Amino acid sequence: MKTLLSILFLFFATYGYSQSEKLFTVDRELSNSNINQIYQAKDGVIWIATDDGLNRYDGAKFSIYKHKEGNDSSLVDNNVRTLFEDSKGHFLVGTQRGLQLYNPATDLFKEIPIFYQTGENMSAHISTILERKNGDLLIGTSGHGVYSLKLEGTEPVIKEAQLPVPSFFI
């Protein structure tokens, strides 16, 4: 009898600590099934970059962010490729057509333009973002090289990174 009670106790104790699972689908929560990156920010929010928008999950509900024509505070492009939060809490979104900084206080996006040497905005495909030890961010683009970004002061400063390898290797 003692053995039976022990087995029942273990069964119910294990069941009580089991993880609940939930399947998120395009039909209900996600903007697209082609997921490029899943990122958990320092505040616990889960961000999901897809081919058709950016999805934010706060543990209770989803919010979907998409490009809105004529709205400079929306995503610059729906094809979100990469996400990154730096050590100071700046949250960056890299899309098929450029780089943006998310402001959680206003729930809006601000474009960080990358310019050719001629001064023309290149609308670069952002492929990766990482932080250097000195706090600068390296922005990898597809076919346009690597750029260094400083997020100090009121306006971000971005310039071509000086690396010991040619940018066409990136």
Predicted segments, located by residue:
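Carboxylate-rich, polar loop motifs that coordinate divalent cations or form catalytic acidic clusters
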Residues: 1-170
